[in-house]
Curated annotation (Swiss-Prot):
Chief location of this protein within or outside the cell: membrane
Family: Belongs to the DsbB family.
Domain of life from the UniProt record: Bacteria
InterPro entries, per the entry: DiS_bond_form_DsbB/BdbC, Disulphide_bond_form_DsbB, DsbB, DsbB-like_sf
Gene3D superfamilies associated with the record: DsbB-like (1.20.1550.10)
Periplasmic topological domain residue ranges: 31-48, 90-144
UniProt entry keywords in alphabetical sequence: Cell inner membrane, Cell membrane, Chaperone, Disulfide bond, Electron transport, Membrane, Oxidoreductase, Redox-active center, Transmembrane, Transmembrane helix, Transport
Biological classification of the source: Bacteria, Pseudomonadati, Pseudomonadota, Gammaproteobacteria, Alteromonadales
Tagged with keyword Nucleotide-binding: no
Originating gene: dsbB
Transmembrane spans: 14-30, 49-64, 72-89, 145-163
Record-given protein name: Disulfide bond formation protein B
GO cellular component labels: plasma membrane
Membrane-protein topology: Multi-pass membrane protein
Origin species: Shewanella frigidimarina (strain NCIMB 400)
């Protein structure tokens, strides 16, 4: 078994994924409560995509030697990374090319069986405008940083895909 395959089959790799996503969620909460930056509905959806990566990592960390759990974890990771990139790209477009006709809603549209904004409004209730870009670092907006983050998640997923899905011999 190759070193990359061994890495994919242990809890440490899934733990790194989990810690990175938890770090992003904590950063989002710091921006919201520490720096008093109001999250928009797209920001909330991006948080949900990061939460999807957390859930995928938790599935993978349960029993990383079991092929089916790795498969489900990898699938959740991929869907969350692609969806998160798409959302961050759309938010970036709203900020770079603002239009009075292309605005985001003030109310998140979560499924009726999972109203996250009702269950945990302090985390999932939007209070800001999508066209606002109140924070940047190195002349890069938060939406652009999230595009980079989700792209990195996607590249790492691609590197881990085949070794993770091969069974141990």
């Amino acid at each position: 078994m190759s070193q990359l395959q061994q890495f994919c089959h242990n809890r440490f790799s899934w733990g790194l994924l989990l810690l990175s996503a938890i770090g992003l969620e904590l950063a989002a909460l710091f921006f919201q409560y520490g720096m008093d930056l109001a999250p928009c509905v797209m920001c909330i959806y991006i948080r949900v995509a990061v939460l999807g990566i957390i859930l995928a990592a938790l599935i993978g960390i349960l029993q990383p030697k079991v092929w089916l759990l790795r498969l489900v974890g990898m699938a959740g990771w991929a869907v969350s990374a692609v969806w998160g990139f798409k959302l961050a790209y759309e938010l970036n477009q709203m900020q770079v090319n603002p239009s009075p006709f292309a605005t985001c809603s003030f109310y998140p549209e979560f499924p009726s069986f999972m109203p996250l904004d009702t269950w945990l409004p302090s985390v999932f209730s939007p209070t800001g405008m999508c066209s606002d870009s109140p924070w940047s670092w190195l002349s890069v907006s938060m939406a652009q940083w999230m595009m980079l983050g989700f792209a990195i998640y996607g590249v790492i997923w691609l590197l881990m895909l085949l070794p993770a899905l091969k069974s141990a011999k």
